[in-house]
A protein has these predicted regions:
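Active-site rim helix/loop that mediates acceptor-substrate recognition in acyltransferases
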Residues: 3-7, 29-83, 193-215
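Conserved N-terminal entry element of GNAT/NAT acetyltransferase domains
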Residues: 1-22, 159-178
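Amide-forming acyltransferase catalytic core, primarily the GNAT-like/NAT-type
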Residues: 27, 124, 144-243
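Conserved beta-strand in the GNAT
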Residues: 68-70, 76-85, 92-97, 215, ...
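Conserved acetyl-CoA binding element of GNAT-fold acetyltransferases
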Residues: 89-101, 237-251
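Conserved active-site alpha-helix within GNAT-family acetyltransferase domains
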Residues: 105, 109, 121-126, 133-152, ...
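Conserved GNAT acetyl-CoA-binding A-motif
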Residues: 93, 119-134, 268-279
Length: 324
């Protein structure tokens, strides 16, 4: 007699295929079902993971390009997906998920290996992802595929508050000045971490009106920038939180000024607080946020593929959010 496991392993998912914008409802369903089941296994019964804002999905899909991959079942329904991103030599995966009824049959390994292969083929030198640190199953699963645990990423929030003067915003510049600002952001980033490039994310955020990039200058020279989203993360929610996706500060002494510029922008844009996802390697930045009144909200475990480690900025602070 066939068992449930026999039935699962007998099925074959077709993929990877490129993600289409019309796939967003299907992606949302798989995302919600998979992570709701993950919380249930962790003892958080009754938690239902909501759908993400379709505009955020569009950003993730267009940012990833051909790195956005889906696998389909016999009825063409989405049964798994992996969204692999690269920013110059920095590569990471997320979100990625498999429908609960398709798990335990090897599909999870297939989609992760596809993401690894795509990132390696696109000359990334960093291949990483994040997972919940309390979830031993996930950590063991990724470790079996060659990922090594790194430090925690800690999410902290600061309340929005007015500042003395608003920072310059990329979205309000002329087309020519935007080109110049992009070049400055690239130069600043690569002066701290060679090969990193957040130009595409800056331009896409502007094109989709999801947020903006703050440009902090001293005597006309760019000393910091912060790419952030103000659009709600969850479908149907109001604007509550400004999320910092990328942040580069030339010197730790300028970190607080950049944070205060973000707090001011949050107030001006109608959001209640600013969320920073701080990699554990930047302990001084973490301590500064706590001293400013930052509240710890969440933790994630950062993991990188063996042979593809994540570097720390040689000077200054470079924060890179590995979630959308």
């Amino acid at each position: 007699m066939a068992t449930a496991r026999d039935w699962k392993t007998a099925r074959h998912a077709d993929g990877p295929h490129p993600v289409r914008l019309s796939d967003i409802p299907g992606l949302n369903q798989v995302f919600s079902d998979a992570f709701t089941e993950r919380y249930r296994r962790d003892g958080m019964v009754g938690v239902r993971v909501p759908f993400l804002n379709p505009a955020i999905w569009r950003y993730a899909i267009e940012d990833a390009g051909s790195g956005a991959m889906v696998w389909r079942g016999e009825r063409e329904e989405i049964v798994a997906f992996n969204i692999a991103h690269r920013s110059g030599i920095e590569g990471w995966m997320g979100p990625l998920a498999v429908r609960p009824e398709w798990q335990s049959g090897g599909l999870g390994k297939e989609i992760v290996r596809a993401g690894i292969g795509w990132l390696a083929d696109h000359a990334t030198r960093v291949i990483g992802l994040e997972t919940m640190p309390r979830t031993m199953d996930n950590i063991g699963f990724y470790s079996g595929l060659g990922f090594l645990p790194s430090r925690l990423t800690i999410t902290l929030t600061l309340d929005a508050t007015g500042g003395d003067a608003p920072a310059q915003l990329y979205g309000r510049l002329s087309a020519r000045d935007k080109d110049d600002a992009l070049a400055e952001c690239l130069t600043l980033t690569q002066s701290m971490v060679a090969g990193y490039d957040y130009s595409r994310e800056i331009m896409l955020t502007d094109a989709l009106s999801l947020g903006d990039t703050l440009l902090v200058r001293e005597a006309g020279r760019l000393v910091a920038f912060a790419l952030c989203h103000t659009a709600p993360l969850v479908e149907g929610r109001t604007r509550e939180e400004l999320r910092v996706l990328k942040m580069a500060v030339s010197d730790p002494s300028r970190f607080e000024a950049c944070c205060r510029a973000l707090m001011d922008y949050a107030r001006r844009s109608g959001t209640r607080r600013v969320a920073f996802r701080v990699q554990g390697a930047y302990v001084d930045a973490y301590a500064r946020l706590v001293a400013m009144g930052g509240r710890v909200r969440w933790t994630d475990l950062r993991m990188t593929m063996a042979g593809y480690p994540e570097p720390q900025a040689e000077r200054g602070v470079v924060l890179s959010n590995w979630e959308i």
